[in-house]
Amino acid sequence: ITGLDGKYYLMFALDMEGSCRLGLASTSDFATFKFLGIVSGEDNRNGVLFPEKINGKYLRMDRPNRVQKEGGPLSSSSIWLSESDDLIEWRGRSALIEGRFHYWDEFIGSGPPPVKTHEGWLHIYHGVATHFQSSNIYQAGVMLLGLDDPSRVIGRCRGNILEPRE
């Protein structure tokens, strides 16, 4: 859920037959919602909007699903950045960060909307370690993106900031 332009926008995964797309809805009161449409043209999930326009464009991070592990769902190991004039049609997609093989964040995806700080956009993302004998362990990490150019990764935590212990 992202507050933007006086409304709240919800970007969500639409599980469809054989694939997953990103859907977008808006609300101003959380009692009624308006479905705005399907906003991804390919198998995709973990979409999150930036809470303000940057250089006159709406920005979103998402995770195209391109990898299928044996017996598992289609997933991916990268977070992408794209831009839009209207929140519906998206273009200019490019990889922002990649998962790290045999590390806590082999498969990754965005978390909540990024937070604007004086140093840049702080973004929490999730990672999945898949190399623990088929026991997927979800963890959280953090990265900092350029304030005026979020395609620039200023820093990314080497270790996780949150993980389950039991």
Language-model segments: which ranges?
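Beta-rich carbohydrate-recognition and catalytic domains
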Residues: 2-48, 52-106, 115-166
